[in-house]
UniProtKB/Swiss-Prot annotation:
Binds 1 zinc ion per subunit. The lineage of its organism: Bacteria, Bacillati, Cyanobacteriota, Cyanophyceae, Oscillatoriophycideae. This is Methylthioribulose-1-phosphate dehydratase. Gene3D superfamilies: Class II aldolase/adducin N-terminal domain. Its EC number is 4.2.1.109. Keywords: Amino-acid biosynthesis, Lyase, Metal-binding, Methionine biosynthesis, Zinc. Pfam families: Aldolase_II. It comes from Picosynechococcus sp. (strain ATCC 27264 / PCC 7002 / PR-6) (Agmenellum quadruplicatum). InterPro entries: Aldolase_II/adducin_N (IPR001303), Aldolase_II/adducin_N_sf (IPR036409), MethylthioRu-1-P_deHdtase_MtnB (IPR017714). It is an enzyme of class 4 (lyase).
Length: 212
């Protein structure tokens, strides 16, 4: 293994453990990955306590989600196919993060019928690549949960034009965010999570019609 890949594993481990500390990866849930320069995806192994996540807990797979040496005998998470879809369809992306925060889980259910949560006026919107002002509205699409990952990826393909803001929600499940570097992916995740938390707090004051 290259020194660069080992370094990336250690960096992503630190991010994963931090997200667990923040309550965004309960009960061994969530998954994370990075793509190296040889188009090898290193994705987090299923069933590992994210508070204890270590570099050896990554599995190497190709862009179709098939395990590569020395991990051929290990079955990766079914959601690996979502990571593969993102890398295949958004050239230049090198990191994908998936969290299960309370805000993402609840709001994705509340607004599932609208197929998106829309944010406007937030200063942190400018943390999403390509956004230059808070004076705009930006949508985070919501997709129905589906245990069949091939079927789910077909949903993504059908609405791919909605995925240009580096994130989406799965109803009553969680958030996916990505970026051209690990730092950018983390920034995108933090922006979405912050705005979701703000909207959830706002619901406590003024519930929308969808929540009544």
């Amino acid at each position: 293994m290259s020194l660069e890949n080992q370094t990336q594993k250690e960096r992503l481990c630190a991010v994963i453990r931090q997200l667990h500390t923040q309550g965004k990866s309960p009960a061994t849930s969530t998954n994370y990955s990075f793509l190296d320069e040889d188009q090898v995806i290193f994705v987090s192994r299923s069933g590992v306590d994210k508070s204890q996540f270590q570099p050896e807990d990554f599995i190497a797979v190709d862009t179709m989600g098939l395990p590569l040496p020395p991990d051929e005998g290990i079955k990766p998470s079914a959601e690996t196919l979502i990571h593969c879809f993102i890398y295949q369809n958004f050239p230049g992306i090198t990191c994908v993060l998936h969290t299960h925060s309370v805000a993402a889980t609840l709001l994705s259910g509340i607004f599932a019928a609208k197929q998106a949560v829309t944010f406007s006026g937030y200063e942190v919107i400018k943390g999403i690549a390509g956004q230059t002002t808070h004076e705009t509205a930006i949508a985070l699409p919501i997709f129905a949960n589906d245990q069949d990952m091939k079927s789910f990826c077909q949903q993504l393909a059908q609405r791919q034009e909605e995925l240009n803001n580096y994130g989406f929600l799965i109803a009553k499940h969680g958030l996916y965010a990505w970026g051209e570097t690990m730092a950018i992916a983390k920034r995108h995740l933090e922006v979405w999570e912050f705005m979701l938390e703000c909207e959830l707090e706002q619901l406590k004051i003024t519930p929308p019609l969808a929540a009544r």
